[in-house]
Amino acid sequence: RSRQDKSVSRAEHDRIITLVNSLTDAVLSTDKDGIVTIYNAAAMSLLDVNAGIHGRHINDLLQLTTLQHQPLDVFRQLSRSPAIRVRDDILMLLKHGDKIRLEATFAPILGGHSAVADGYVLILRDITKAKSLEQERDEFISVVSHELRTPVAVAEGALDNARLLAQRGYTRKVYEALQEAHRQVVFLARMINDLGTLSRTERGLADAPEVIDQIPLVKQLHETYAPQAAAKPLAFNLDIDPQAGSVYVSRLYLEELLQNFITNAIKYTPRGAITLIVRRQQTHVTISVKDTGIGIGKSDLNKIFDRFYRAEDYRTRQTSGTGLGLYIARKLAQKLETTIHVTSRLNHGSTFSFTLPIYH
């Protein structure tokens, strides 16, 4: 009978160990004195150890602090928890000096009907990335709200001014006020379009990949944007390799990426020319948009793909923009499984390009 009970107990213990090891969160179980009795693979990974956890005191294993960097007595937190308690304001110092943000669940192990704990369970979850994304989201919403508020206020003021001027018969000044309101509405529309594109790329929404003959696509984009270029006036040239071939990608993402490059080139090229180039190199094709515009300074080159970043150059500041264009371009390139390459000299223009495999 005793042997059978031991066998059942052993099987139950093995089941618990298997269950605990299947969890992705770090689990550490202690006796009533804080000595570790059970732990899982995730705990070993978090602590960056191969062995030596069993039989050690929980306080010796974990160096935790609050967000205010106050040391946290782990065993005290466990022993003071009459019921399950969760905290997400905990930092853990790693061996190489970095810190991670943890969510900790403290729980007593109650034996039978006793209110006295036989031991404790600590569950640790790494929430560093989740909190970082949460902070990014909050910052994004804050910046977007500010960026949208400004043109709305300017447009509202311009329209109110136009109404007053109309009442007084100042026809020309009414036209100027309406022009300003129109500029702000166009800016708003562009930002909303950028936000829509960004949302699609971050959620992974796109047309299914298809075989795309590049020459008709590039010619169509040239035809679409030629009037905008001519209005500045700028020369808009095509330089297409007749052997460019086809690619197998999302048409939506490819068009939006090229539109992004072309509109940027038109915006930041006060005079000269823009050239849309398609070049084949054996198994790949490189598509480039080259301009003779204001160029990008060396100090800005590694920041231009950051969200809401705009170069400090006064000519950039004089040109309206959302600061989302190149950030979105990078996202689109990632969806197309390619990388954007930029070459630029201040006052001499820029070239933006990417490479795709030829579809056979």
What are the residue ranges of the model-derived segments?
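Conserved glycine-rich
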Residues: L336-T338
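Short alpha-helical segment of the dimerization/phosphotransfer core of two-component systems
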Residues: E180-L188
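Conserved catalytic submotifs in the C-terminal HATPase_c
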Residues: E210-D213, A230, A235-G245
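Short, charged amphipathic alpha-helical "coupling" segments at sensory-output junctions
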Residues: S2-T18, S22, K129, L133
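Short conserved segment of the HATPase_c
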Residues: E139, I296-R310
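Terminal output helix/cap of sensory domains in signal transduction proteins
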Residues: A51-D98
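Short flexible loop/turn segments at helix-to-beta-strand junctions
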Residues: R172-K173, R203-L217, Y248
